[in-house]
């Protein structure tokens, strides 16, 4: 008789189904035509009805099934009676069939921290740049990102009426990453993906030092990591505070599971324990290959300006 799935694999299987539901909610809000936009701190820091509904859906669905989890979400929402339509109780069967890496087989529910970004790329969502948008559910153990799920609600949205809309990517360190086709960036090219809406002199100085052949300015940390694993960019360079732990936790897992690397600008691993500060104050540097080339070119002036 096969052993029952471990806590980690059950959690990932749930997160997959919950992320798929989240993608449906994101599309429904657009279809209904009222985004319910609120400015949180400034004109580039927005929250929509989709952010609010998806956060309630993800956090409530996870908390009901895994009550001992620590769940940290981007949006501050008042406690409310949850609409049952927002609850997802399913678990993706294909994930439950996968073996749990042995180093995680004895993990208890209370040892895990889940970082949730209900809508990564909110500004782009409000502007109709729908392929930039992702839903991110990252899972951390002992401060390290070990499993993650990314839903792209509008994947294929420009591929014609017969295309399947949306996809869900998932991964576990030691097992692999699934739901996409791994592709290398063009050999010998330095293609940088970076922020679309949070540019600064530091960001510009750091990118210039990389001697880029091309610079892609797009929204969403999840979207930028997907560009790396699908060969559209060589490095994600963001020499600035701004992105948070819920932006990087899930994408980092997917990248690391296929041999890539994500750190801060100093080369330090990011920490995801529940007490950690939410801001990635020393920026982000990520690559699928050739990490050392990009890390070696970060100017000392940039490092001096960004304190971990």
Swiss-Prot record:
Mg(2+) 2 binds at residues 117, 120, 247. It comes from the Eukaryota. GO terms for biological process: phosphatidylinositol phosphate biosynthetic process. Its cofactor is Mg(2+). One of its GO terms (molecular function) is 3'(2'),5'-bisphosphate nucleotidase activity. Pfam families: Inositol_P. InterPro entries: CysQ/Inositol_MonoPase, Inositol_monoP_metal-BS, Inositol_monophosphatase-like, Inositol_monophosphatase_CS. Its EC number is 3.1.3.7, 3.1.3.57. Binds 3 Mg(2+) ions per subunit. The active site is at residues 51, 122. Inhibited by Li(+) and Ca(2+), but not by Na(+). The modification N6-succinyllysine is found at residue 244. AMP binds at residues 195, 198, 220, 224. The modification Phosphothreonine is found at residue 122. The modification Phosphoserine is found at residue 240. The modification N-acetylalanine is found at residue 2. SUPFAM superfamilies: Carbohydrate phosphatase (SSF56655). Mg(2+) 1 binds at residues 74, 117, 119. CDD domains: IPPase. Keywords: Acetylation, Hydrolase, Lithium, Magnesium, Metal-binding, Phosphoprotein. It catalyses: adenosine 3',5'-bisphosphate + H2O = AMP + phosphate; adenosine 2',5'-bisphosphate + H2O = AMP + phosphate; 3'-phosphoadenylyl sulfate + H2O = adenosine 5'-phosphosulfate + phosphate; 1D-myo-inositol 1,4-bisphosphate + H2O = 1D-myo-inositol 4-phosphate + phosphate. Phosphatase that converts 3'(2')-phosphoadenosine 5'-phosphate (PAP) to AMP and adenosine 3'-phosphate 5'-phosphosulfate (PAPS) to adenosine 5'-phosphosulfate (APS). Is also able to hydrolyze inositol 1,4-bisphosphate (Ins(1,4)P2) and inositol 1,3,4-trisphosphate (Ins(1,3,4)P3), but is not active on AMP, 3'-AMP, fructose-1,6-bisphosphate, Ins(1)P, Ins(2)P and Ins(1,4,5)P3. Probably prevents the toxic accumulation of PAP, a compound which inhibits a variety of proteins, including PAPS-utilizing enzymes such as sulfotransferases, and RNA processing enzymes. Belongs to the inositol monophosphatase superfamily. This is 3'(2'),5'-bisphosphate nucleotidase 1. It comes from Bos taurus. The lineage of its organism: Eukaryota, Metazoa, Chordata, Craniata, Vertebrata.
């Amino acid at each position: 008789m096969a052993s029952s799935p471990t806590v980690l694999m059950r959690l990932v299987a749930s997160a997959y189904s919950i992320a798929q539901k989240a993608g449906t909610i994101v599309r429904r809000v657009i279809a209904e035509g009222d985004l319910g936009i609120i400015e949180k701190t400034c004109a580039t820091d927005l929250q929509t009805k989709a952010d609010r509904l998806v956060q309630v859906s993800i956090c409530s669905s996870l908390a009901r099934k895994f009550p001992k989890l620590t769940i940290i979400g981007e949006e501050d929402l008042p406690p409310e009676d949850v609409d049952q339509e927002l609850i997802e109780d399913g678990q993706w069967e294909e994930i439950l069939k996968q073996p749990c890496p042995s180093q995680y087989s004895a993990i208890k529910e209370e040892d895990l921290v889940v970082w949730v970004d209900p809508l990564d790329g909110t500004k782009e969502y409000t502007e109709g740049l729908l392929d930039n948008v992702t839903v991110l559910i990252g899972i951390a153990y002992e401060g390290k990102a070990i499993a993650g799920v990314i839903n792209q609600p509008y994947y294929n949205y420009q591929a014609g009426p017969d295309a399947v809309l949306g996809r869900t990517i998932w991964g576990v360190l030691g097992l692999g990453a699934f739901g996409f086709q791994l592709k290398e960036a063009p050999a010998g090219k330095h293609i940088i993906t970076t922020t679309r809406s949070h540019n600064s002199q530091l960001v510009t100085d750091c990118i210039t030092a990389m001697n880029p052949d091309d610079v892609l300015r797009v929204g969403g940390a999840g979207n930028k990591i997907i560009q790396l694993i699908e060969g559209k960019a060589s490095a994600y360079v963001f020499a600035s505070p701004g992105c948070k732990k819920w932006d990087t936790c899930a994408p980092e897992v997917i990248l690391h599971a296929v041999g890539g690397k994500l750190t801060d600008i100093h080369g330090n691993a990011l920490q995801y324990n529940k007490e950690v500060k939410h801001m990635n104050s020393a920026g982000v540097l990520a690559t699928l290959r050739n990490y050392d080339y990009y890390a070696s070119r970060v100017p000392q002036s940039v490092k001096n300006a960004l304190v971990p």
